[in-house]
Structure formats: C-alpha cells, structure tokens
Amino acid sequence: MKMAVDDPTYGTPKIKRTASSSSSIETTVTKLLMSTKHLLQVLTQWSKGTTSGRLVSDAYVQLGNDFKVVSKFFMHAKVDMSDVGDVPMALRRVLEVTLREPPSDETLNKHLPKIREIIVTLLDKLKVKQAILKNMQQEHRISVKSHHQQNPSFTSNLSLGSEGTREGTPLSSRKSSIVRDQRQSDSVENSYGEKVNSTSTGTPSAQSAEATLTKPRTNIKQNLKSNNAPNASDDDDALSQLKKGTNLQRRASKRYSAYHMAKLTNQSTTEAAAAAGLMTTPSPSMLHLEETVRKSKLYGNNNNDDDRNINSAENKGKSIDDVSKASPLAKTPLPIENVRASPRRLSSVVTTSPDKAMNGTCPVFLRIGDKTKKCHVQLPTTKNALRLLFIERFAYSPGANSFPDIYIMDPQYGVFYELEELNLLDIKEGFVIELKLEENPNNTIKEFIDTVKMEISNSQNDIIRHLKEMSFGSAISGKQTEVLPQPGLEANKHDLVGQNKKDDDKTIKDIQYELGKIKQVHNINRSNINETIFNILRKVDNFKSLSFSAKNSSNRMYMEKSQTELGDLSDTLLSKVDDLQDVIEIMRKDVAERRSQPAKKKLETVSKDLENAQADVLKLQEFIDTEKPHWKKTWEAELDKVCEEQQFLTLQEELILDLKEDLGKALETFDLIKLCCEEQEKNPSRSKSNPILPIMRPGTFNQVREQVMVAVQSLNPDHDSRVEAIDKAEKMWEMERKLKASNEFDDELENFVGNSNLKKSGGFEEVERIRKQKDEANLRAYFGPGFT
C-alpha cells in the first residue's frame, strides 16, 4: 500500500470522481425537489377534484425513486444516510389515509401538515449531508496537496533518471505532459486559493503574504516571454481553456434547488436563491491566484529560481492558514451568538411584566411613519399575520406596489433591522414593529404628471409649427408653378416620341413583374394580419365571457393558469439546458482529453439546439414581460399570496439570467470545440503523435509491476457513475442515429423551404395573369387583330 501512495497519480482519479459525483448529487437533489413540488401540486389538484388518486400515486412513486437515487449517491460518497430514515414509507402511510377520505380542502388541510413535516425534515437532513460532503471533499483535497508536497513521486524519479533520453523529445510532447500534470492538480489548487482568498481580507499578515505571492508571478511572466515557442498556434489557448472545464457552472439548477428547498423549509427564498447564484461566481482574487499557480506549474520546470519562488509562495500559503486558525477574527460567530442571546435574556425578563394578557397574547407596538399604535399578537406569529395587522389597525393598502419591508427594534441596542422568517421567534413583549414606507410617493407622482404635461404641450406646439410651415411652403410652390413659363414641353414631346418602343415595353414588363411580387407579399401579409386579428378577437370574446365573481374570480384562475404555464416552461427549459450542458461536457472531454474530433453533423445539431434554447429563453422573457403587469393588478386584491408570487417571479427572472449565463458559457465552450476541430483539421498529424515514454532503470520492472497490481486491487468501481455515463451515452447514440437517418438532400430541402428561400415570382395571381395574356394573344393571332 505504501507503493500505491507513492504513485504521483494516486488520489487524482478520486478527485475527479468526487467532483463528478458532487455535480451528480446536485442534479439528483434538483430532481428530488421537482418530484416533491409535483407531489404537492397533484395533492392540491386532487383536493379540488381536478385529478384522480392515480396521479397522486404516480407522483409518490416518482418521489420514492428519486429519493433512492439520492440515497445511493450519498452512500457512494461515504456519507451516512441511516439517520434519514425510510421517507417513502412514512409518506405512504399518510397518503393512504388521505386518499381513503373524499377529496376536499378540509381533507388536505387535515393531512398536509404531516406531509410537509416529513418533507421539511428530509430537506433539512439533505442540507446537512451536502455540507458534510463538501467538508469531506475539501479535507481530501488538502490531504492530497500536502501529500504531493511532502513525498516525491516514484514516476518523477524514473523520469529524472532518464534525463538524457528526455532531452531528445520534442517540445509538444513535453508540453502535453506538463498540461496533464497541471490538469490533475487544478482541483487541489482551487481549495488552496480559497483559503488564501478568505484570509487575505482579514489580517495584516495575510496582506503581506499576498504581496509575497505576487513576486513569483513576475518571474513567471518573464519565463513566459522568454520560453514561448515561435511556432505556437492559437489552438493552445482554446485547448487549455477546454481542459480547465470551468465554464459550465449550472447556475440555474443550483438556484432552482436552493429556492425550492428554502420554500419547503419556510426560509427566505430570495436570499437562498441569491446565495446560490453567488456560490457559482468565483472572486477575482481567487481567479488571479489560480492563474498564478497554474502558470507556475506549467513553466516552473524551466528555471530553478522559479521553483524556489513557488515553494516560498506555498510556504506563505501555509503561514496564511496558520494565521487564519490563530486569528481572533475567525471566531467572530461567538460574540454574535452572545449578542443574540443577550436580547433574548432581556426579553425573557420583559415577558414577566404584568401587562401580558391572560389569553396568551403579548403587547407590541406598531408604527407607520409618525403614527404608533399598541396591539396584542399571538406569539409565535408570521409575517402575513403582521401585514394583516397593519392593514386592520392603520387601514393601510400597498396598492399596486409591493408590500413594504417590516423592521423590528432590538431593545438592547435600539437599532432597527429587517424582520425575516428566521427572526420571527425573536419578537417578544414590548417590541416595536415598524413598516418602512417610501418617502413622499405623492411628490414623485406629481413630478411625473407635470413632466408628462410639459412633454405633451411641447409636442403640440411642434406639430402646429410644422403644419404651418408645410402649408406656407405648399402655397409658395403653387404660385411659382403658375408664374413660371413652360418652354420645354414641345421639346419633351419630340424626345418621348423618338425613344425606342421596345425599351418601353421591357420596362413596363419589369414593372409589372415587380408589382406582381409586391402583390404576392401583400397578400401573404394580409392573410397573416387577418388571422392574427381573428385570434385576438376570439381571445377578447373568451375574456368577456369569463365571470368576475368574488369567490371564483377569473383573475385568480388566470393567475394560476399563468403560473402553471410559466413554471412548466421554465422547468422544461431548465431540463433542456442541463441536457445540452451534459452533451457539451462530453464533447469537451472528447476534444480536450481524448483528442477525438466530433462529426460535423453533431456540431451543427448542437449549434441548432443552442440557438433553439436561446430562442426559448427570449420567449420566456417575453412571456414574463407580458404577464407581469397583470400579476401586479391581481396582487392588489390578494395580499396573502403576493410575497410568494413575487418571489416566484423573481426566481424566474433570475433563472433567465442564469440560463443566459449558462447558455453563454455553453456557447463559449462550443466555440472552443469548433476552434479546436478547425485547428485539428489544419494539422491532422499532431493528434496522431505517439508519446515517448522514459526508459526504466535496470531492475525496477518488478517494482513497477507490484505497484500496478496494488493500484488495481485498490480500485473502487463507481457503478452509479457508470450508469449515468450509460444514460448520457444513450442520448448521444440517439442523436447520432437521427443524424445518420437524414441525408444531405433532406437537410438542404428542409432548410431551403423552412427559411422561405423560394424565389418570389408573384404567386398564382401572376401566373394566371400571364396565362390570360397568352390566351388573348393566341385568339388575336387566330381570329385577327380586330378580335376582342
């Protein structure tokens, strides 16, 4: 086993498997959240009588399958799942009791708390498991890095022993081996960069260490300038960026998972989704450090001074870690907890006052602007209950705007801070709860009205002035035409008579042909406009026929229908983008690591899929822009659900930004793939170069063989990743099968007809007109020129 540890590649495949399993776990957790959301939606529809119990059973089966997949992934990652329990069995017991009763809102309200409790417990435990898995990955990366720093590799000794042989190897093979070593150590250096980055902002010693880290960078830049080969091509940068593989970040999937997990666990969905979006964005200092370490690894073997600089930087990194451990700033959560504990102790003393009501309610103070009122609330309370309390006591209405934020005052420090779901338990007797309003909204409205009036008056004056100028100019031009003589009329008549009649006929025919084409386009546009007007009128009639009763308002029906449609569109697009990223990731590995060139049809198909996904994102954006004003009008009358729907809309808008970012990164990766393919087509012999292996020392063959056998025995096959790879391979096979089924003629015909590339000839009206002219000409030629 010691020989296996001395292997330089030991631990590197495990790092890659851990990174891939981490992304797979995030994907499976996202699918589990989708199944949970679908089960709750189906239960709501079942209570209203729109669906049957069969669909509820199908949703439960899907949730159970997704739970099993998540459990397998965590168990394969060495995370204990015994404390989670049998969640599908617990859900089954509650659902069986629920489905035996008649579907109604009372039945759902009776059993829904148990179902939500099971789901919330599951999600809380999954969050803990994800945190444990993340810590395990960081500890493993740190241990592997420390092992590489302390123990020299056996393979490197072999390569050093054969120094004379390596001097005859070409530069390209050396560069490829260096890039492979750099790719294996990227994941370790990322964790190292995070440590330095998190500490450099807190202590002065970290700033000095960061200044020391910048010194090797200057030496590395000098080596880069002196050691660059003159025959380096542009595909090196593209290939190195592909080998990094940091473009595909799956921001939309992470934001979706964080939002729904926070929603089901009654946490702040806006902050959770925003935090998920920030987690995938690396800081500039971290990127700078990664680039420095990468360049030092890539070109550090050319100069011994650079090696010493890099080692000094690593030693500084260790000292930075020691500073972060010993620094008192790393223990800042302890005083924060003490600060939070002190107002609770104070509030516990306050709650013993005689003002406390006998029915379990506590007095609090509500404030809006300069008005303050005292009222009693039942603790613990909710944000919606506080909003309704403000509406009841102050007759407040937010109108078409969003409900303002609620602030509470800390009794110990006298500072107002925003009330969140996590801080609802902090509300005690005697707390001041304030509703923050925008300052002087009426002044803004008045300024807007005055601006509009001024613009309207200015535009009216401009229109009147232009009309006067036009009328005055037309009168002057008419007088000039009456006064001026016309001496050239006779000459023009003689010139017109002397022109060639054949040219006139040809010009007339050309004009008729162009008019025929214009008429054809006009007819097509007119038919499209008529069809659009008909659809609009039909929708208006359907809208007029809807009822506006208070109990079953069409606004609520329209809102639910729009939400369902928007959610289905975003979920479908999210799955589509994830599948597209999987395909591009496979192509990236094929091009960057295996040096295999994908087929042109595959590149064209992926390019079309990217364009379609971007078009779907634009459609989703247009849908949101159209529906957002209608949603705001509905929010005026329905205060209870306004915050949830606004958060849902904010999520969709942020998902659009994330999807655009993901598609941009996918498009960037795809462009790099095409660039590498073009360079490989220009230089086909480079990909076929055989690597020159170093000659082993005499008598070391048995040692190498034992090392290989120990490495084979220590292999741990990853069956789940193999199943996932088989699924992805089946998708690729299906795509290739469709590509092989179509030939070039079908593709060209589809593109030619679909893009409306047919030449405009005037349509059937022009053909009919020409036929009539020919018929008349034939009749005149047969019966004589006098025939009509």
Swiss-Prot record:
Entries under Pfam families matching the protein: AIP3, Aip3p_Bud6_N
Ranges where the record places region Disordered: 140-253, 298-338
InterPro entries in alphabetical order: AIP3-like_C, AIP3_C, Aip3p_Bud6_N, SRCIN1
Annotated positions of the Phosphothreonine modification: 12
GO cellular component, one term: secretory vesicle
Keywords on record: Coiled coil, Phosphoprotein
Biased segments, Polar residues type: 149-162, 187-225
Coiled coil: 573-628
Protein name: Bud site selection protein 6
